[in-house]
Amino acid sequence: MGSDWDEIKRLAADFQKAQLTSTLQKLSERNCVEIVTLLLEKQMLEVVFTNDGKEYITPDHLEREIQDELYVNGGRANLVEVSKTLNVDLSRIELLAERISAENQSVHLVLGQLIDEDYISHIAQEINEKLVQRGEVSISELASQFDLPSDFLQHDVVEKHLGKIIKGRQDASNPRVFFTQAYIQRCKAKIRGALAAITRPINVAVILQKIGVQEKIFYSLLDEIAPAGQVTSKQANSQYVPHIYAKTQADWVNSFYKQNSFLEYDAIQKLGISDAKSYIRKQFPNEEFLYLKRVALGARLVELTVVTALNECSATKQYLDLTTILPSNLSEEDIEEVFSTIMAQKHSNPSNFVYLDGIVFSQPYLAQLVQPCQALAESQAKAAIDGGVYQQYIVEKTLAQKGNVSTQELEDEGKVDKRDERRKKASSGKAGGGAQGRETKTKSTKKHQRGKAAAQFDSDDEDDAQQGSRGGGGASKKAVKPLELVKTADIVKLITASLEEEGLEHLSKSIASLYTNQFNQTALARAQELFEATPQTNRRQTHAAIQDRINTLLIDIRLYEKGLKLFPQDTQTQLVKYLLKSLGNEICNELSLYVASECNLTVKNTNLNVDQRNKLAQECEAQYRAALLEQNKALNKSIDDFELATETVLKTCSMIIKKVDKKKDRLLIADHKKKLQKQLLECNEPALLLHLAALILFTTITGSILHASGKFVSAILQHIRGSLNEDQNALLLRYHDLVLQVLQAIPDSNESKLANEHLQTMQNQVVELAQNFSRASISKAD
């Protein structure tokens, strides 16, 4: 202490001596500037000018000034601030700072700042204090706090003083984190206590939130703690599952399986187990399971219960209700999946069983159940043959397979030709006509005796040209709808009674649908057998029927010819033409279809026009072709020509023409008149009533029958006019005029209503005249 005081005294004396000593020579400021400039030019002196250029300083002195600033600022100086303080360019300051840090190992140049060891020791002490307070610090936090690079802080500050000034340790998993041993012990105690208190699965995030421990520390200390549980993963949604809970889960699963021999995935998932199948495999490594979509069945339940019951069902030829042997909480989908899986895994033949809504039927049981359907198929096949349904199906099928019928021809055959329709109406035709020769359009009458068709009002010959001009397009096949002889409803009726006894009537439709196609095919096969077994018998019956039919029509034509010959020549010509177009056309159709059948040709529609018959004749065998074509041509000639042509066709068909028996003519005429009178009594339409009345009066007066359409009514009334008295003629003429008035008037108009009222009043008189008129009345009139 004394030596220091002596040194101070010595320095004070030197300072006083310097102040009292005078210089030998004083220089002016200008001289000083010139001297310094000269020294600089001769590079004998190096100085650093200030920013304003008024002052200069040597580099060594500037270096001392920088070190002084570092000391003044506590060991950390920003070079920018030093540059401002010393008024020296920043670049000169940076160069000197680099030299200082290079020459002095205790000084560091970091991001434009000079930092000495004193400052580093100071912040190390601060870091230690913070570590003591918080127990854990990270380099990133320190870098933010001290505004220093993280690498500098970690290597030159923390790691350098770790264990010396900084009392802590570095995290092995994260080198940028440091903590104290006391902090680690506190965290370990928190984690151990929290995990010990948990009895059910809980998210790790919840645990960390409750105890205030960081996730990385939790996972790093978890293995050291050895908790009574396990963490599912280290992901964000990881859970901690205590061993006590896992044991409880295992106990519940084992108990449930022991009692029920199956496990539900949903029930296991409710226990907190996400992958139920994996858990079952892990929990029961030595057990075999049948894994379904919703449940896992144990091998004991499958082998001893289900498989055994199925074998018994097959042996006894009965059915098995799976719902009675499987757990009650299984759905229908689960039960069906059990059956399907067993069939696949146990190598059973699925064809031995039929599964329907939880019920497994053996094939023998179902075969016995539907046995009565064999008789049903037999009866349906016979009915199809007797009714001609199967024959029609064969025709359509053959036609579709050939594919040689044009589209337009199919359309033509599907449409009813106007002329053919008129020829199939009642022979009395339509009512109308009058003394003035006006035509009237009315409805047709009904058929007369022996099935002869009556005709409608024949409009004109243009219909013939239009019908004959219809042509066909290209060939096309037409799909044929499969014939259903046995339907599902038929089978349901037969099996419902047997199923009701077992309480299974709700499955009748499902079972019937399984066998509908089988029995329908059986019925079709049986129908084919019947069809093939009776062709000759059917052919003989068809030959006889056609022969009788043609002879009947020829007799009708002969009788009608007698009646039409009573008219003038021009009217006769029209009546002959109409007669041939109706009854003659019908004869041609009958013979053409018969010949087509003999030649094994298929015809879809039996109502043929002239063109269609000609095309059909071209396809027939040569022995029939010429006769059929000639008969078609004769329709436009006389009745005698047509009869001769028809006889030729009959001979080619080996049919006999019956001899004329004139004794029966009067009976036929009387029978025809009775038919017309019956129709008249049932008729309420004025136009048709007048038509029938005219035909009846003609037959009564002439003793002949007449085949005429509605347009000939006026000619008929004119012909019988002389056989009636004035009142009768006036009645018929007045009635005829009223009919025309109704047809020409607007429907529901006053004129139409008034005319209908008059017609209604006169109707009984016209009916009475037609019904009661006799030859005696003719004599009285004369």
UniProtKB/Swiss-Prot annotation:
Region feature Disordered, mapped onto this chain: 404-478
Disulfide bonds: none
GO molecular function, one term: UFM1 transferase activity
Annotated knockout phenotype: RNAi-mediated knockdown is lethal. RNAi-mediated knockdown in adult neuronal tissue results in reduced adult lifespan and progressive locomoter defects due to neurodegeneration, when in combination with knockdown of Uba5; brains show evidence of increased ER stress. Neuronal cells in these adults display defects in autophagy.
GO cellular component: cytosol; endomembrane system; endoplasmic reticulum membrane
Family matches, as Pfam families: E3_UFM1_ligase, UFL1, UFL1_C
EC number: 2.3.2.-
Protein's UniProt keywords contain Transport: no
The organism's place on the tree of life at top rank: Eukaryota
Enzyme class: transferase
Keywords: Transferase, Ubl conjugation pathway
Biological process, per Gene Ontology: protein ufmylation; response to endoplasmic reticulum stress; reticulophagy
Similarity remark: Belongs to the UFL1 family.
Stored PANTHER family: E3 UFM1-PROTEIN LIGASE 1
Task of the protein: E3 UFM1-protein ligase that mediates ufmylation of target proteins.
Protein name: E3 UFM1-protein ligase 1 homolog
Originating gene: Ufl1
